[in-house]
């Protein structure tokens, strides 16, 4: 398998941190960009995105490795998106479109991380990739728009839908429940949701 030079928007999150651990250390800056501790890439700024992808492509050529962009950046506040869908769209859809355009211009492959929220959520079996999307939330609508922008914007693109991601770093449901358990005598959580908890390190390795 060829060595990769990664650009990971959203590199400060759970998935980004695990991707950073998988990057070849000896490649230095060409091995991983926008890792924890570095400045985050603003995917809503098309010029900045174009410059970042161009720099990745050049560094990869100089190092003899394969450049790949993994988009882990997202507006993930599901409830808040209902009040500010425009902001969610700016990141989840327009930002994804900017990445797709930049990757197409440089012939850099793009892996876009999406969500099960693109489906209606009322099925009685696990969803298949071929099932028709039918988002019922602002978050889901903006993520579906991002998927379509990526797949329509560059031929060398893949969409990976995941759900209930948790990991060693960052905020997630598991950490929230552990914190609340220490603060409260009793906890109330929904009991009518079924999903696929996804360990972020496993997801990173799969990508």
Which residue stretches match the model-derived regions?
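Catalytic helix-loop patch of NAD(P)-dependent Rossmann-fold dehydrogenases
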Residues: 83, 90-98, 118-160, 164-165
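NAD(P)H-binding glycine-rich loop region in Rossmannoid oxidoreductase-like domains
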Residues: 43-93, 102
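Adenosine-cofactor binding site in Rossmann-like domains, unifying the SAM/SAH pocket
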Residues: 27, 31-52
